[in-house]
């Protein structure tokens, strides 16, 4: 009886997985089981870090706004600024406020003085 060659399905699946891991180093780009483990781990990390990125940027914006507001030598804090913004119904989010704080501090000082009075 002649020998039957294996099909292409498993090879195609492994090739697809190897293409995903082609930029990895060492066994993580060569051994199929290790590639599969690393692929799962990398997808988990990317999913987790997409949420983490939003948290990190929000913290950065808050820190920048707070630093500029407190650097004005006025007894005024970030929480009071945000509270007054909401009270006055000004639609400035933290990202925009942080950009204003870095690029044009005088504008932020004007905004804070306007909403305080």
UniProtKB/Swiss-Prot annotation:
Localisation: Plastid, Chloroplast
CDD domains cross-referenced by the UniProt entry: Ribosomal_L20
GO biological process: ribosomal large subunit assembly; translation
One Pfam family linked to the record: Ribosomal_L20
Main subcellular localisation: plastid
Cellular component annotations (GO), alphabetically ordered: chloroplast; ribonucleoprotein complex; ribosome
Signal peptide (residue range): none
InterPro entries: Ribosomal_bL20, RIBOSOMAL_L20_CS, Ribosomal_protein_bL20_C
Annotated GO MF terms: rRNA binding; structural constituent of ribosome
Spans through the membrane: none
Keyword tRNA-binding: no
Keywords for the protein's UniProt record, in alphabetical order: Chloroplast, Plastid, Ribonucleoprotein, Ribosomal protein, RNA-binding, rRNA-binding
Role according to the record: Binds directly to 23S ribosomal RNA and is necessary for the in vitro assembly process of the 50S ribosomal subunit. It is not involved in the protein synthesizing functions of that subunit.
PANTHER family named among the record's database cross-references: 39S RIBOSOMAL PROTEIN L20
Similarity section: Belongs to the bacterial ribosomal protein bL20 family.
Protein name: Large ribosomal subunit protein bL20c
Source organism (scientific name): Eucalyptus globulus subsp. globulus (Tasmanian blue gum)
Gene it is expressed from: rpl20
């Amino acid at each position: 009886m002649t020998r039957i060659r294996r099909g292409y399905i498993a090879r195609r699946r492994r090739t697809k997985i190897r293409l995903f891991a082609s930029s990895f180093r060492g066994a993580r780009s060569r051994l199929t089981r290790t590639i599969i483990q690393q692929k799962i781990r990398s997808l988990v990390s990317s999913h987790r870090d997409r949420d983490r990125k939003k948290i990190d940027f929000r913290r950065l914006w808050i820190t920048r706004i707070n630093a500029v507001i407190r650097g004005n030598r006025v007894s005024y804090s970030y929480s009071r600024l945000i509270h007054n913004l909401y009270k006055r119904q000004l639609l400035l989010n933290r990202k925009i406020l942080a950009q204003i704080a870095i690029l044009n501090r005088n504008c932020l000082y004007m905004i804070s003085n306007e909403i305080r009075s």
